[in-house]
Structure formats: structure tokens, C-alpha cells
Amino acid sequence: MTVDEQVSNYYDMLLKRNAGEPEFHQAVAEVLESLKIVLEKDPHYADYGLIQRLCEPERQLIFRVPWVDDQGQVHVNRGFRVQFNSALGPYKGGLRFHPSVNLGIVKFLGFEQIFKNSLTGLPIGGGKGGSDFDPKGKSDLEIMRFCQSFMTELHRHIGEYRDVPAGDIGVGGREIGYLFGHYRRMANQHESGVLTGKGLTWGGSLVRTEATGYGCVYFVSEMIKAKGESISGQKIIVSGSGNVATYAIEKAQELGATVIGFSDSSGWVHTPNGVDVAKLREIKEVRRARVSVYADEVEGATYHTDGSIWDLKCDIALPCATQNELNGENAKTLADNGCRFVAEGANMPSTPEAVEVFRERDIRFGPGKAANAGGVATSALEMQQNASRDSWSFEYTDERLQVIMKNIFKTCAETAAEYGHENDYVVGANIAGFKKVADAMLAQGVI
């Protein structure tokens, strides 16, 4: 049986066993396509059911999360934690609170996390979790009660050497605080390393808040350097206006680029003169308002609900909002308008059709598992500080982050070239991430 037939047969089986989970199917299909050339060159990676084991989570947890609102009404949400692979270290990955969360989305995120964490070079496995709870419009007390109920079940399954959750969409510093506080009460011990993204006064790390956005910009900067250019003077569009987008904007402008647009789920803002990051943070983090407020209050900025942020002419696009936000037509528009670099700050924000357009039009593309690995890398640095009862300076931690992102880019570029796909960072990221995990799994036996 040829490698193509082996992969096709396994993927057909995966579709049947995981019906109704399109995001998970999409993530697996992309990786399997890249791995065909590995299996042809190194057939031992097909031994002992390795591919099947890699695509099947070690553990999937689904649990009830009952909570009481401010009016005394009881609500019941569903909680998830997918502990996907621990060959390299304890499961590591965020918690997402959003109405769209279901098992398939958590599995897709957890699967991507395996390769992302592997690429960091740090000893962490892959996992992900969350709930279909919507924190929007909820009071602080309602969010606290939900987090406490969620942790009442989750605490049985996590620990600094077992599984270390963090934040994601809908889970920021406030939620991590409530989750950690309840874990501390349930476990009857102050186990700092059980969660990352903590507050600075109780075990958190400097740069963790900025890390995903900063890391994405460090990665795309390396992509640009590889073409003999500089990020300085480039025009950039950034989708989203949350944590990742905000700090990507901040770092890009620090390095001399001009960010000409950002967005949220309601619309997008054109900022031809650049973004006032302090104003954006005040609107989103303090007032928790829509991006339209930015356009109302900042001269030269305009708010739009028609069209798409991807319609703007730019040199670099950084999708930093959510999965599958950038489709094939958007990609064609970017290419027609002169975009030359795309790096994913979010998890799988580009559809397969968009990625294919990037390849066809020679747009250098940094996939999320590489470009947005700065967040989990700095989470692992937070774990190091917790384990040694230490606290590092902002400058030192940021330097570590820069080195990690440069090494990730170098690894992706060298691996892509080794397998005959020069400058295809998707192939490079998938193969490099896979080989490290696969070697560990083969060494540890069939478990």
C-alpha cells in the first residue's frame, strides 16, 4: 500500500469516528498532507500505529457546569478538557469561554497545540479546554460563580506536572484569578504552576500578556528578513482587537511599521496614520466597548461595517481574531492589493482555500502553530519561574521570547528546505513539530 493510500484510509476512518467536527478534520487534514513526504522518506514513522495514536486524544473530558446568575436562576453549561498528547511534557493549552465551543473545536485546538508546543523547544505536551459559557454581558460575580463551578470539576484532572491550563478567548486575567483561587481552595495548597497567565503579584510572568502578539510580529519580522527586507516602513492590517491583536499592533509600530486597520466582530476600523494603542486598550480593556468608539474618538480613523478589513491595501496581514476568518476570496483580494506576507496570530484563521491562494500567489505564509507560539512559550517560561520560585525582568523574558520565535522560524525554514518545500512554512512547521513528538512517542512505547 502506498503512503497516499495509507493516509487516505486513515483519514476516512478518522472522519467516521469524529463525525460533525469539521474544524478538527481540517486541522488533521493539513498535517497529514505535510506528513506524506516524511512517511515516504522515513517509513518507520508509520510503525506502531503512530499516526493513529497521534490523532487520538489521550483523554477527553466533558462535564456539567451549573451556576447561578444574579437573579437566582440556575444555568447549566458544558465544560471540556482534551488532554491530547503528553509525550514531551504535561498537557499545556488554554481555556476558551465562548458560545461556539464544542468538542470538535476543542479537539482541533488541542491537536494544533501539540505541534505548536513542540516547536517551542520546551518540554510541554498539547491540550485545550473551555466551555460554551458566554462571559459577555455577565457581571463579575456571575463570572466568578461560573469559574468556581468549572474548576470544581476540572481541578481533579490538572496539576503542574499533569496538565497546565491558561487563558484563551473569553478567559483573561480576571477569569484565571477566579479559577486559580478556587483550585487553591479545593486542593488546599498554593500550587503556582497549575495555571499560567496569573497576576504578577501571585506567580505570573512579565510579558505573558503581550507574548502572543509580540511573538507573531517577531516571527513575521524573520519572514521579512529572509527576503532581505525589514518590517520598518511596511503597512500592516491586523484583524481583531483583543489581547493578541492589540499587542501585535503595539510591537509592529515599535519596530517602525504602520498598522492601517483593525477590527472586531461588529466591523473594522481604517487607521491610515497608525493606531493609538493606549486609546485602543482603554476602549477594549477598560470600557469593554466596540471598535466603532475608536473611530468616533480618534481623528482620521473611520469605521466600516461593509466589506472586509482584508479589502485594505497592505504589505502584511496578521489575522488575529478567530478560526477560518480569512477565506479564499479574501486571500485573492490581499494578493491583488499587493500583500506579500501573512502570519497567523489566531489559531487556524485562514481556510485551506486561503492557504492555497497564498502558495499560488507567492505570499509568504506563517501558520498559527508557528507564528502564534509566543503565548504558550511564555507560559512555559512562567512555569519555569514558578518551579524555581523566581521572577524575571520584562527585558530578560522578552529576550527569551525573541530567541524562541527566531528559533521556531529557523526550524520551520530549514525543515521545509530539507524536504524540498523551501519557504513553505506550513510544511516546515508540521514536519518539525511532528518529528520531535513522534520520536518521543516511539521511544516511550505503545501507550
Curated annotation (Swiss-Prot):
A GO molecular function held by the record: glutamate dehydrogenase (NADP+) activity
Record bears the keyword Cell wall biogenesis/degradation: no
Entry keyword annotation includes Transcription: no
Binding site residues for NADP(+): T212, N243
Residues at the active site: K128
Keywords: NADP, Oxidoreductase
Organism superkingdom: Bacteria
Pfam family, one: ELFV_dehydrog
GO cellular component, one term: cytoplasm
Sites where the protein binds substrate: K92, Q113, K116, G167, S379
Catalytic reactions of this protein: L-glutamate + NADP(+) + H2O = 2-oxoglutarate + NH4(+) + NADPH + H(+)
Its EC number(s): 1.4.1.4
Signal peptide positions on this chain: none
GO biological process, one term: glutamate biosynthetic process
Family note: Belongs to the Glu/Leu/Phe/Val dehydrogenases family.
Primary role: Catalyzes the reversible oxidative deamination of glutamate to alpha-ketoglutarate and ammonia.
Protein name: NADP-specific glutamate dehydrogenase
Organism: Corynebacterium glutamicum (strain ATCC 13032 / DSM 20300 / JCM 1318 / BCRC 11384 / CCUG 27702 / LMG 3730 / NBRC 12168 / NCIMB 10025 / NRRL B-2784 / 534)
Phylogenetic classification of the source organism: Bacteria, Bacillati, Actinomycetota, Actinomycetes, Mycobacteriales
Gene coding for it: gdh
